[in-house]
């Protein structure tokens, strides 16, 4: 990923008492999975360009019901993800090196 990148921590709380809410939850998770790495059930670490961040935020805003759902996006200092400490079972880190097939 060339150029400027940002590290984002995304957390969300989507109301799931209705089938529509459960659908929104799956949609939010699927969107986040397309951009980053799930580190907890409703928490993702994403490294992207500022332009990609705009696309991500637009997709998430479209997916939720703002009257019932909440998404928080924290922009972190670059390199913050590398300093994370885990207690308990930690998720596997994302593959960051180029793949040779």
PLM region descriptions:
Residues 20, 54-56, 83:
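Short acidic, gly/pro-rich beta-turn/loop elements at beta-sheet edges
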Residues 63-100:
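C-terminal structural segments of small proteins and small subunits
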Residues 30-33, 57-62, 85-88:
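Intrinsically disordered, low-complexity boundary segments flanking structured domains
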Residues 40-69, 73-76:
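Aromatic/basic micro-patches that form nucleic-acid/chromatin recognition or nuclease catalytic surfaces
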Residues 1-39, 43, 47-52:
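Extended, hydrophobic alpha-helical segments
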């Amino acid at each position: 990923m060339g150029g400027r990148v940002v590290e984002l921590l995304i957390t969300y709380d989507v109301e799931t008492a209705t089938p529509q809410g459960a659908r929104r939850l799956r949609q939010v998770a699927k969107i986040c999975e397309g951009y980053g790495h799930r580190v907890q059930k409703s928490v993702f670490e994403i490294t992207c360009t500022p332009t990609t961040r705009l696309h991500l935020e637009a997709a998430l805003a479209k997916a939720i019901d703002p009257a019932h759902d909440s998404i928080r996006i924290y922009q972190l200092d670059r390199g913050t993800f590398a300093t994370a400490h885990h207690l308990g079972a930690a998720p596997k880190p994302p593959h960051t090196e180029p793949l040779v097939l």
